[in-house]
């Protein structure tokens, strides 16, 4: 059955990468194939934590999409877009850097999917006002979100999985990974001009933006206050996850329910931002990856890679980092990390007498988080961003994303390798 699972996954992946077939249709067809053959059962799909649909991701997306849909009715995105454009004096590069910094910071405190859902509408409005292409801005922001999410325990789902298995705390992530994330973020900003080239804006467009009054963009101040109060509660619950142990998906759904109750909006108004295609694509992708996990393909690949190290902790850390990045770029990093954590735990236990035994855990988290930038389906935030871009009339192809993402991933992993080497194997001794 492993051959069948691999064949279906590779065929689906090739079709998705070709950009010639609707990716949601491909994902659902591939999912149907692994069920019919049968490689995976309905119980595996709906109830298994390891091989099933990640309902936490699905419901987090639904909740945050509804919250964004309600928030859009207030005009706050227009306000933020005008404010950002005016503070940057209409310079596309300065606007991009500002939005990149906001995306990275927000992803460290929330999660990168939520960040993309909140920042993307602002980006679309800024680009519309200046009459410039949105694709460069959206890609830069999702790169920053995946990088920023590595900084904290709650920033990226793989970090939560690693922390749970390794017994690491919120403060551990802040102490060990945040310094590297700052370095990688600076490197990302430095390569932005080379990555996306120069973006020109017509002078009259800049003059028009500078003449705008952002205060006039707010259409419903009462609803904005209600949204602000709910968002504060939602964000606080996200940050307090290590203490409250309330799943982010439940928090998002509760927040969405509260806003629906107090907003007075119609069903079509608050559901207008729900990306149904994106949700179905995720479901299909989770099912196909679940088939790879169930048949032992991912486990066999990971075990073969880690056995090459011969028990040396330095080699183990670098191999985990190097293997995690490309694999996380090909399959979603959540099921990959869920599969790898038992193996890393076993390796750490065997090497217990060696110094820096937590380093393989940091290598796994960094490889999975940074590797998410490699391809368009490497991280949940990427898929969400592509869906938003498509609906906005500015679709981003799989290969366009991958060409840029490969550069960002290579720089990030190179800096991560240097950081791990210096901090844990040179300066520590």
Curated annotation (Swiss-Prot):
GO terms for molecular function: arsenite transmembrane transporter activity. It is a multi-pass membrane protein. It holds the Pfam family CitMHS. It comes from the Bacteria. It is found in: Cell membrane. The chain crosses the membrane at residues 26-46, 51-71, 99-119, 135-155, 173-193, 223-243, 278-298, 311-331, 361-381, 407-427. GO terms for cellular component: plasma membrane. Its main location: membrane. Keywords: Cell membrane, Membrane, Transmembrane, Transmembrane helix, Transport. Belongs to the CitM (TC 2.A.11) transporter family. This is Uncharacterized transporter MT2758.
């Amino acid at each position: 059955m492993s051959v069948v699972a691999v064949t279906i996954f590779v065929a689906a992946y090739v079709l998705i990468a070709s950009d010639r077939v609707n990716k949601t249709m491909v994902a659902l067809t591939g999912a149907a194939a692994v069920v019919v053959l049968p490689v995976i059962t309905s119980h595996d799909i709906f109830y298994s934590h390891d091989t099933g649909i990640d309902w936490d991701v699905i419901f987090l997306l639904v909740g945050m999409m509804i919250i964004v849909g309600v928030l859009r009715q207030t005009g706050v995105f227009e306000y933020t877009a005008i404010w950002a454009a005016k503070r940057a004096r209409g310079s596309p590069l300065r606007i991009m850097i500002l939005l990149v910094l906001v995306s990275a910071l927000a992803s460290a405190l929330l999660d990168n999917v939520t960040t993309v859902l909140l920042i993307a509408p602002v980006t679309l409005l800024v680009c519309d006002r200046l009459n410039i292409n949105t694709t460069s801005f959206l890609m830069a922001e999702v790169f920053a979100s995946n990088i920023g999410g590595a900084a904290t325990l709650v920033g990226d789902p793989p970090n939560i999985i690693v922390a749970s298995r390794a017994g690491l705390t919120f403060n551990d992530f802040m102490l060990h990974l945040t310094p590297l994330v700052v370095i990688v973020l600076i490197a990302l900003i430095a390569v932005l001009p080379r990555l996306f080239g120069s973006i020109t804006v017509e002078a009259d467009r800049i003059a028009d933006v500078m003449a705008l009054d952002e205060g006039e963009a707010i259409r419903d101040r009462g609803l904005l206050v209600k949204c602000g109060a709910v968002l504060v509660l939602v964000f606080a619950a996200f940050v307090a996850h290590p203490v409250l142990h309330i799943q982010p998906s439940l928090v998002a759904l509760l927040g969405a329910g509260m806003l629906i109750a107090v907003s007075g909006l119609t069903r079509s108004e608050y559901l207008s931002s729900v990306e149904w295609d994106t949700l179905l694509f995720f479901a299909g992708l989770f099912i196909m990856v679940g088939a790879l996990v169930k048949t032992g393909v991912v486990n066999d690949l990971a075990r073969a890679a880690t056995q090459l190290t011969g028990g040396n902790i330095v080699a183990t850390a670098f191999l985990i980092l190097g293997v995690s990045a490309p694999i996380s770029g090909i399959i979603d990093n959540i099921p990959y990390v869920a599969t790898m954590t038992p193996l890393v735990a076993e390796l750490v236990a065997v090497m217990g007498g060696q110094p820096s035994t937590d380093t393989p855990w940091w290598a796994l988290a960094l490889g999975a988080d940074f590797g998410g930038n490699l391809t368009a389906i490497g991280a949940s935030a990427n898929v969400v961003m592509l869906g938003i871009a498509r609906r906005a009339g500015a679709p981003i192809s799989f290969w366009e994303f991958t060409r840029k993402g490969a550069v960002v991933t290579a720089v990030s992993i190179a800096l991560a390798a240097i950081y791990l080497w210096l901090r844990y194997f040179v300066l520590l001794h």
